[in-house]
Swiss-Prot record:
Tissue expression profile of the protein: Highly expressed in young fruits 15 days after anthesis (15-DAA).
Gene name of the record: UGT74-345-2
Binding residue positions for UDP-alpha-D-glucose: 286, 339, 341, 359-361, 364, 380-381
Keyword Ribonucleoprotein on entry: no
UniProt protein name: Mogroside I-E synthase
Extra information: Mogrosides, the major active constituents of S.grosvenorii fruits, are a mixture of cucurbitane-type triterpenoid glycosides that have been proven to be powerful and zero-caloric sweeteners and can hence be used as a sucrose substitute for diabetic and obese patients.
Keywords, comma-separated and alphabetical: Transferase
InterPro entries: UDP_glucos_trans, UDP_glycos_trans_CS
Coiled coil: none
Domain of life per record: Eukaryota
Length: 460
């Protein structure tokens, strides 16, 4: 399939930004692209055909970001396994990306690529272009995975193992990144991000200095002393962070799906009717598939409690709910298949975020001052949960007695600790502190703003 355009003819660009075709990777890199545009760069955001089929792009008409599409349709049938898909993706996209660059009369000066696609650097440099990786995980997770890549750390670690890494708090085995499915393939995929780390002139991290440069964890400082790392986050729409410095930047402009307008309106009417800090917001991201037993345990807790809740549950997960749960809890609960998470987290009625601790969700909660109850599932979420509970002190991590599920009783103990327990004031105080520091980082003259400005000056 030939390259196509999303918003008109192909325009000359200073920078091409290319994300791996998954929602959690594209959203922060799309937001980073908007920041570059706001500082005067001409930016092309490159997406693949599979992304256009699974995601809704809805940038405002005023956006000057150039969206272009290249094919990732596999040339082989070897995509039944994750390993086969990744191999086919690399083979196909290496070629279509090269063709895209070759087809530009006035080529860009720079490519910013998703760090999970390190081979993009080879494609770029083969055509005389500079390239830089953009890491969508926290600095702490990058630090851990880099040590795994270098051979000084093995994952999974034996139970009850204490892990000490430079400029990090002591970690237990349960705090390390977890790869329950296809562990060898996923591990290789995640650690390959560091295969050409030493060759980059710029390395972008979606975090902010204050968040990972405090006493318990100075990992940004430690890594920046060794590599050209620049923090550029949080990559969240301007309306929620720096008082709308970016025009019309009220949403990511990228959704997995969108409900009917009537249903969307009902969510906000329902939230508006609730008291301040009275609603639990529950969401486990776009990829997590919970065991039916786990969904039921959470439902049993919500049914028996007196707390109001907004629960985002994909259509494929609804069948796991107990019979008549939605009807029996409708007087104080709402179950939806989609919502604007930023709008929900910024609503005065929300008291707590029950989350899987994906990095985007964690950053959004920190940036909007919302305490968390962490129920991590896999990959980086376990490490993020450790920092939420023990380093940033903005919530708790649910303790499991059974490795398979979190019970109703364990959920109740953790959630009540955050919304009603003695520590609730500390959690909220810390959440507000991080909200303030996140805003300062991206505001004019803040640490992330300065780093972006420095990059722009080398390109313009």
């Amino acid at each position: 399939m030939d390259e196509t355009t999303v918003n008109g003819g192909r325009r000359a660009s200073d920078v091409v930004v290319f994300a791996f075709p998954r929602h959690g990777h594209m959203s922060p890199m799309l937001q980073f692209s908007k920041r570059l545009v706001s500082k005067g760069l001409r930016v092309t955001f490159l997406i693949t055909t599979s992304a256009t089929e699974s995601l809704r792009l809805n940038l405002p008409p005023s956006s000057s970001l150039d969206l272009q599409v290249i094919s990732d349709v596999p040339e082989s049938n070897d995509i039944a396994t994750l390993e086969g898909y990744l191999r086919s993706f690399k083979a196909t996209v290496s070629k279509t990306l090269a063709d895209f660059i070759d087809g530009i009369g006035n080529p860009p000066k720079f490519i910013v690529y998703d760090s999970v696609m390190p081979w993009v650097q080879e494609v770029a440099r083969g055509r005389g272009l500079d390239a830089a990786p953009f890491f969508t995980q926290s600095s702490a997770v990058n630090h851990i995975l880099n040590h795994v890549y270098g051979g000084s750390l093995s994952i999974p670690a034996p139970e009850n193992t204490a892990v000490s890494l430079p400029s990090m708090p002591v970690l237990q085995a349960e705090d390390l990144p977890a790869f329950p499915d296809d562990p060898e393939v996923v591990m290789n995929f995640m650690t390959s991000q560091f295969s050409n780390f030493q060759d980059a002139k710029w390395i972008f991290f979606n975090t902010f200095d204050q968040l990972e440069c405090k006493k318990q964890s100075q990992v940004v400082n430690w890594m920046a002393d060794r590599w050209p790392i620049k923090t550029v986050g949080p990559t969240i729409p301007s309306a929620y962070l720096d008082d709308g410095r970016l025009e019309d930047d009220r949403a990511f402009g990228l959704n997995l799906l969108k409900p009917e307008d009537g249903k969307n309106t009902r969510q906000w009417q329902w939230l508006d009717s609730k008291d301040t800090a009275s609603v639990l917001y529950i969401s486990f991201g776009s990829l997590a598939i919970l065991q039916e037993e786990q969904v039921k345990e959470l439902a049993y807790f919500l049914k028996d409690t007196n707390l109001s809740f907004l629960w985002v549950l994909r259509d494929s997960e609804l069948q796991k709910l107990p019979h008549n749960f939605v009807q029996e809890t409708s007087h104080r609960g709402l179950v939806v298949n989609w919502c604007s998470q930023l709008q929900v987290l910024s609503h005065r009625a929300v008291s707590c975020f029950v989350t899987h601790c994906g990095w985007n969700s964690t950053l959004e909660a920190l940036s909007l001052g919302v305490p968390m109850v962490a129920i991590p599932q896999w990959v980086d979420q376990t490490t993020n949960a450790k920092f939420v509970a023990d380093v940033w002190r903005v919530g708790v991590r649910v303790k499991k007695k059974d490795e398979r599920i979190v019970t109703k009783e364990e959920l109740e103990a953790s959630i009540r600790q955050v919304v009603q327990g003695e520590g609730r004031n500390e959690f909220k105080h810390n959440a507000i502190k991080w909200k303030k520091l996140a805003k300062e980082a991206v505001d004019e003259g803040g640490s992330s703003d300065k780093n972006i400005e420095e990059f722009v000056k080398t390109i313009a």
